[in-house]
Amino acid sequence: MKPIDFKQVDNWDDWMNGIIDADMNIGGECIAVVNRIYDLLLAGKICQLAYSSGKDSETVLGLFLLALMKAVRNGDDVSPYHFITHIDTKVENPEIRNLADRKLSALKDFIEANKLPLTIVIAQPSITSSWLMRIIGGRGLPTFANSEYRQCSQDLKVATANRATSSYLAKIDKSLHEHVILILGSRDTESQHRSDSIAKFGGSSKYITTNADTKGRGKSTFYPIKEWSDSDVWDFLSNSGTGKFRTIPSYLPNHYETIDLYRASGNGECVYFQSSSTTKQGSCSARHGCFVCVAGNADKSMEKLITTDAARYGYMAGINRIQRFLYLSRYNWDYRHVVGRTISAAGYIQIRPDTYHPDVLAMLLHALISFDYLEKQRADAVANKLKTGEIEDNDTNRRMATPMFQYVTETD
């Protein structure tokens, strides 16, 4: 008698039935997106995910893992070179940075446990293009509101991502490069600017689009959640996890930390569980970025966190003052060096307000180091209270017992 083959089925195998039974608002589209990604995998494409750890890229990652787990468990012949690129700008909101680090650690463990053909690529700006070297080093000014060119975005994110991608692909046979598909979490409803940008490049959630990059090479992209609303995204995340009442499997127990952070830093309220009658409820509109960003008049998400829960997020008040100073310094010519940086063909240098004066740069550096020191003192105080039992021994307090940021290090 032949032995009977059997397979232990879990939520990763049966999630589609779970979605149908749960009557999720986004259930049908979720299944459709996973099937599209699965088809890309079967076609031998190499999927690159641009992952920030925000709600949209988190959703795309979740959808991709559903497709990849299906392929691996089915024994399908797929590329071993799928990869995730994550950019650490080194000047991010510390809450976002710490949450991203914890997610990436959990994702790494999940990839190893399930033997997935997926690599995590984490990149940081080079020393010369870092915010610290450019601004505190006196090489340039912050990217203020209405600037024609977003120098900070180019240096900290775009160039860094391109360099990391090129470095990874250099390890792969060049003939396979044309099979790389960049999967993005951009959505039309984020803003008119984002919608126009997607349309400019012919972005689609139904098929791959290919455009020439800056070097004339074909670059293929895919926008799986292009038409999704904020409510759709929260519907997906609130139903994802490994817990008993989660419909969609995930590498995380749940996405409560992401939901709570957006709720605390935004102008809307997160909807944990939605039905067809609640999709129009307010959703989280918070945007998170670098704590030194002056592309807007204020870091609204950080300020909202501080005012919402000073006991929890008040440690960021100091670095938020740096953002306010930078924003208010834009038209204060007393803060500028009067000697330009560019020498003309005739050998002249313009005398006009240019980068920050060395005295201002010294003050900014002193402020950064001081807030780094104060953060270390705060963390040490929490650690001592944990040891003496003055505060509860829980995940949050253990996390707060180590510095949440250090923006000036010995390597800088």
Q: For the regions a protein language model found, what residue spans apply to each?
A:
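Nucleotide-activated chemistry modules centered on ATP-dependent adenylation/adenylyltransferase
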Residues: 1-48, 57-412
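The Walker A (P-loop) glycine that initiates the GxxxxGKT/S ATP-binding motif of P-loop NTPases
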Residues: 51
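Conserved G/P- and acidic residue-centered "switch" motifs that form tight phosphate/ATP-binding loops
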Residues: 54
